[in-house]
Amino acid sequence: MEIISPTRGSRFPNARLGLFITGLIVFACALLGLRGVDWFLLKKSLRHKFTKIEWISTSELADWLASKRRPAPVLLDVRTEEEWNVSHLPGARCVDPNASAESAAAGLPKETPIVTYCAVGYRSGEMADRLRAAGFANVRNLEGSIFQWANEDRPLVHDDERVSQVHPYNSFWGRLLNDDVRAPVK
C-alpha cells in the first residue's frame, strides 16, 4: 500500500464550501426520499463545478480494466487513509486528498492515463483539476466514484482480499450507498 501525504501548507478551503453546497442539494433530495434524484443532481453539480476535467463512467472503467488491448490506467484513490483501509478498487494507490499533483503522481510520466476517484467525486475532481493544471493531460474522474462502483457490485479489495463494503465518509453521504455495501462508521 502506498500512501501519499500532502505537501506542507497545502490546504484547499473551497473544498469545504463546495462539499457543503453539494451536500445541501443531496440533503434536500434525501428529505424527499429521491435517491435516484440525489445521484442525478450530485453528478450534475460536480460536472458543473469541474468543467475542465474529463469524466469516465463506472462501466467504461470496468471495461478498460478488463481490456487486454490497452494498458490499465493508474487509479488514484483520493480518500483518507481511514476510508482506504475499509476498501478500495483493486490496484489503486492511496493519495491524501490535500496532496499536491506532483506528490500524487510522483514518478509518473505526464502522458500516463490516470483515473481519480473518492467517495462521490468531489475530492477526486479537485485532484483531477490539479493534475490537469500540472500538465497531466490524460486524467479522468470516475463519475459516482467508489460509492457508485460499490452499489453496482464491482470489485473492491482490502489487503488484496475481495470485500463488499465501503467506508461511508459520514452518516450523511453514506446514504448514497446501498445498505448492503455501507460499512458501519466507527
Residue ranges with predicted function:
Residues 117:
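Short, surface-exposed ligand- or partner-binding patches at beta-edge/loop junctions that are enriched
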